[in-house]
């Protein structure tokens, strides 16, 4: 996985430099759409077929996305470069790194919140507000439910984890008692 990140990083950084000259959010949408299309087994199969030219593969990828940026020269050149270098499979990792660069520029971060129970509305807003104060940045939350936590939440922001779940507390107590 780290190897894919290393290979994808220069592509994500180059695309981000291009995006800085325009609408970063629109470029983010484009690269997310390209990543979704490139992740499809059918597309990967067509891309590796010797009967299909590289130009046709690039056109297939661009036609499959809805973003109006796909018609632009920069997007066409980017996709063609990925196809020529056999890097289509890297698009999901490129999209992830592009999003990280975008978040860094905005002073934001993705927050993965795992809760024992569904979080919605004011409860979620209150939690996110508190987490933003703790992490000192704007958070973009995604919420998952995992009943095995018993209660509480586990929050992951970048490489930081805040685990206030009952399961984590029980594990901590067990470790203290058996030590």
From Swiss-Prot:
Protein name: ATP synthase subunit delta
Primary role: F(1)F(0) ATP synthase produces ATP from ADP in the presence of a proton or sodium gradient. F-type ATPases consist of two structural domains, F(1) containing the extramembraneous catalytic core and F(0) containing the membrane proton channel, linked together by a central stalk and a peripheral stalk. During catalysis, ATP synthesis in the catalytic domain of F(1) is coupled via a rotary mechanism of the central stalk subunits to proton translocation.
SUPFAM superfamilies per the UniProt record, alphabetical: N-terminal domain of the delta subunit of the F1F0-ATP synthase
PANTHER family in the record: ATP SYNTHASE DELTA CHAIN (PTHR11910)
Subcellular localization: Cell inner membrane
Gene Ontology molecular-function annotations: proton-transporting ATP synthase activity, rotational mechanism
Keyword flag Ion transport: yes
Species this chain originates from: Burkholderia vietnamiensis (strain G4 / LMG 22486)
Listed GO CC annotations: plasma membrane; proton-transporting ATP synthase complex
HAMAP family: ATP_synth_delta_bact (MF_01416)
Residue intervals passing through the bilayer: none
Similarity field: Belongs to the ATPase delta chain family.
This protein's UniProt keywords: ATP synthesis, Cell inner membrane, Cell membrane, CF(1), Hydrogen ion transport, Ion transport, Membrane, Transport
Subunit relationships: F-type ATPases have 2 components, F(1) - the catalytic core - and F(0) - the membrane proton channel. F(1) has five subunits: alpha(3), beta(3), gamma(1), delta(1), epsilon(1). F(0) has three main subunits: a(1), b(2) and c(10-14). The alpha and beta chains form an alternating ring which encloses part of the gamma chain. F(1) is attached to F(0) by a central stalk formed by the gamma and epsilon chains, while a peripheral stalk is formed by the delta and b chains.
């Amino acid at each position: 996985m780290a190897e894919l990140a290393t290979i994808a990083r220069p592509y994500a950084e180059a695309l981000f430099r291009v995006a800085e000259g325009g609408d970063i959010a629109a470029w983010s949408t484009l690269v997310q759409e390209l990543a979704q299309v490139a992740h499809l087994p059918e597309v990967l199969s067509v891309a590796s077929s010797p009967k299909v030219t590289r130009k046709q593969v690039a056109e297939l990828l661009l036609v499959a996305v809805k973003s109006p940026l796909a018609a632009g020269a920069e997007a066409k050149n980017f996709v063609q470069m990925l196809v020529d270098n056999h890097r289509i499979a890297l698009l999901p990792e490129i999209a992830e790194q592009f999003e990280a660069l975008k978040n860094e520029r905005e002073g934001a971060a993705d927050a993965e919140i795992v809760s024992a129970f569904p979080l919605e509305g004011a409860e979620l807003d209150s939690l996110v507000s508190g987490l933003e104060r703790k992490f000192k940045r704007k958070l973009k939350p995604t919420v998952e439910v995992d009943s095995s936590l018993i209660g509480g939440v586990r929050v992951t922001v970048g490489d930081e984890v805040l685990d206030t779940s009952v399961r984590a507390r029980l594990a901590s107590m067990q470790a203290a008692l058996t030590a």
